[in-house]
Amino acid sequence: MNLTFLIPVKLESEDRVRNLKTILTYLLTKFDAKVLVQEQDTTNRFTKLIMPYLTKRFGIISHRFQYFFDKQNTNYFHKTKILNDLLLKSDTEIVCNYDVDALFPETTYTNAYQAIKDNQCDVVYPYGCGIYQKAVTYKQETFDKFLNSDLDVQSLDKYATISNSTIGWCQFVRRENYIKSFMMNENF
């Protein structure tokens, strides 16, 4: 795939760490795409909390995965700036702005990617209709079981509830047009 996932992150909770491990495992296993992660915080937590897991799981993955740390003196998380930074570091035809709390069936990703590759559109928000989404709350045991399975997201349906679509951002974009459109607005 000529695709890079752009993932801004701040690892401020156990839940965020678990979410990041989940999506990195899923993306690196299911897709032949690049993944760029940029952590922005006062302290680098990724190297201690995520990297040992990735190294154990995947070995050397430097050809598809890159991590960047942006040290901040405050707790402010400037997501739009991080996305712009990652966009400029990417080198693929298509990028995907990706939150750590979004996970879809594999076909959702491939359909969104293919729609852009086939020049049907320049941007895809790979969501269903309406203002609701599935929200999955799970215990560590469920998390471990999912990561050691075939990563079929439908296996998580039994833990899902329907909730308002207020979290979980994902946006596939043709990189060249994204840059031409002046990227993300960093002023808010």
Q: How would you describe each model-predicted region?
A:
Residues T22-Y26, K81, D85, N111-A112:
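Alpha-helical elements of Rossmann-like donor-binding domains used by nucleotide-donor carbohydrate transfer enzymes
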Residues M1-Y26:
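N-proximal low-complexity "stem/linker" segments adjacent to membrane-targeting elements
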Residues D32-N44, F68-Q72:
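Short beta-strand/loop segment that forms part of the nucleotide-sugar
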Residues E93-L103:
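Short beta-strand-to-loop acidic/aromatic patch adjacent to the donor-nucleotide binding site
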Residues E14-R16, T42-I50:
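Short, charged/polar "capping" segments at the starts of alpha-helices
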Residues N2-T4, L27-V37, H63-F65:
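Short loop->beta transition adjacent to catalytic acidic/histidine clusters or analogous donor-positioning motifs
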Residues F46-K89:
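Active-site-proximal specificity loops/subdomain of glycosyltransferases
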Residues P105-E186:
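Conserved catalytic core of nucleotide-sugar-dependent glycosyltransferases
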